[in-house]
Every structure is written in structure tokens, then in C-alpha cells.
From Swiss-Prot:
<comment type="similarity">
    <text>Belongs to the universal ribosomal protein uL10 family.</text>
</comment>
<dbReference type="InterPro" id="IPR047865">
    <property type="entry name" value="Ribosomal_uL10_bac_type"/>
</dbReference>
<keyword id="KW-0689">Ribosomal protein</keyword>
<dbReference type="InterPro" id="IPR001790">
    <property type="entry name" value="Ribosomal_uL10"/>
</dbReference>
<keyword id="KW-0687">Ribonucleoprotein</keyword>
<dbReference type="InterPro" id="IPR022973">
    <property type="entry name" value="Ribosomal_uL10_bac"/>
</dbReference>
<dbReference type="GO" id="GO:0015934">
    <property type="term" value="C:large ribosomal subunit"/>
</dbReference>
<comment type="subunit">
    <text>Part of the ribosomal stalk of the 50S ribosomal subunit. The N-terminus interacts with L11 and the large rRNA to form the base of the stalk. The C-terminus forms an elongated spine to which L12 dimers bind in a sequential fashion forming a multimeric L10(L12)X complex.</text>
</comment>
<dbReference type="Pfam" id="PF00466">
    <property type="entry name" value="Ribosomal_L10"/>
</dbReference>
<keyword id="KW-0694">RNA-binding</keyword>
<dbReference type="GO" id="GO:0070180">
    <property type="term" value="F:large ribosomal subunit rRNA binding"/>
</dbReference>
<dbReference type="InterPro" id="IPR002363">
    <property type="entry name" value="Ribosomal_uL10_CS_bac"/>
</dbReference>
<comment type="function">
    <text>Forms part of the ribosomal stalk, playing a central role in the interaction of the ribosome with GTP-bound translation factors.</text>
</comment>
<dbReference type="GO" id="GO:0003735">
    <property type="term" value="F:structural constituent of ribosome"/>
</dbReference>
<dbReference type="InterPro" id="IPR043141">
    <property type="entry name" value="Ribosomal_uL10-like_sf"/>
</dbReference>
<protein>
    <recommendedName>
        <fullName>Large ribosomal subunit protein uL10</fullName>
    </recommendedName>
</protein>
<keyword id="KW-0699">rRNA-binding</keyword>
Length: 174
């Protein structure tokens, strides 16, 4: 018979799985508690979270959430990274952290939307522009034509002012 704590944990995991746009399953073997906390901090800054949960409870939650694709990645010490907003930002934070740690830790795989991804796919996702970078590009694209129009209008106004000034000066002399 499952305990209330385990039932609550499965419910929390199911909720996270349902809310997440991306879930990554990683082997964290070899990381110290301080390093794991640093990883959590970096992922939290990107709008995600990293948790450690028992594989059996994660498996139950995955079945409840309809995300059974991750079951093949659940084995050994497993960290779960959830991204609720900035998929490339969280993937990049994890990828950069793992590369910088120089330990034999890796992302086993995960889910982006409804698609299963492998550890190799995570590197490609990490290279995508983050949400903020994408917004900056969009706003820059929108702003560029307006800036050119304003620049053109300033030039026209400057020319009109020059012509009126020259005409007024000519009238004063004449």
C-alpha cells in the first residue's frame, strides 16, 4: 500500500510533467551536493527546475501524465530537469554546466512537447536561440523599418528647414 508521501510525490511529479514544455532526464552520478545545487540555481534562472525523484515514482507519474516515452531513460541516479518557459535556455544551462564540470555526466534523453529526444538532441536544442534572444531579434526586425522612416523624415525636415532658412535670408538681403 503506497504511503501518503509517495502518493503526494507522484501527484507533484504528474503536475510538473503536465506543465513542462520540456523534460530532460540526466545521470547526475559524480556530482557533489554543492554542484547539484549550482545546477539547480542555473536552471532556475532560466525558468526551470531540477529535482531528484525515485525512478519508480517518476515512472508512475509519467504513466499518469501520458509521457511514458521517458521510462527508458529512468535507471540509476536520475535528475529531472523541467522547463516551463525557455526550452533552449534550460537546455543550454544544463549542457554548459555538464561540459564545464568535466565529469562523466550526461543527459540520457527527454521530451520536448510531445517528441522524445536523445542526449545528442539536447545539444542541438541548447544551440537554439533563447526566448529573450528570439524576442530581441523580432523586436529588432520590427524596429528597423521604423528607425529608417524616422531617419528619412528627419532628413526631409532638415532639408525643409534649410530651404526656408535660405529663402528667409535671401528675402532679407533682397
Amino acid at each position: 500500500m503506497p504511503t501518503q508521501a509517495k502518493v503526494a510525490t507522484v501527484a507533484e511529479l504528474t503536475d510538473r510533467l503536465n506543465r513542462a514544455q520540456m523534460l530532460l532526464v540526466a545521470d547526475y552520478r559524480g556530482l557533489t551536493v554543492a554542484e547539484l545545487n549550482e545546477l539547480r540555481k542555473k536552471v532556475r534562472e532560466k525558468g526551470g527546475e531540477v529535482i531528484i525523484a525515485k525512478n519508480t515514482l517518476t515512472r508512475l507519474a509519467a504513466r499518469e501524465a501520458g509521457k511514458t516515452e521517458i521510462e527508458e531513460f529512468l535507471g540509476g541516479p536520475t535528475a529531472l530537469a523541467f522547463s516551463y518557459d525557455d526550452i533552449p535556455g534550460v537546455a543550454k544551462a544544463i549542457d554548459d554546466f555538464f561540459k564545464a564540470s568535466k565529469k562523466d555526466i550526461k543527459v540520457k534523453g527527454g521530451i520536448v512537447g510531445t517528441s522524445k529526444i536523445t542526449g545528442a538532441d539536447v545539444e542541438r536544442v541548447a544551440k537554439m536561440p533563447t526566448r529573450d534572444e528570439s524576442l530581441a531579434k523580432i523586436l529588432g526586425g520590427i524596429n528597423a523599418p521604423a528607425s529608417r522612416i524616422v531617419g528619412g523624415l528627419k532628413g526631409v525636415m532638415r532639408n525643409i528647414a534649410y530651404i526656408l532658412g535660405a529663402h528667409a535670408q535671401k528675402g532679407a538681403e533682397g
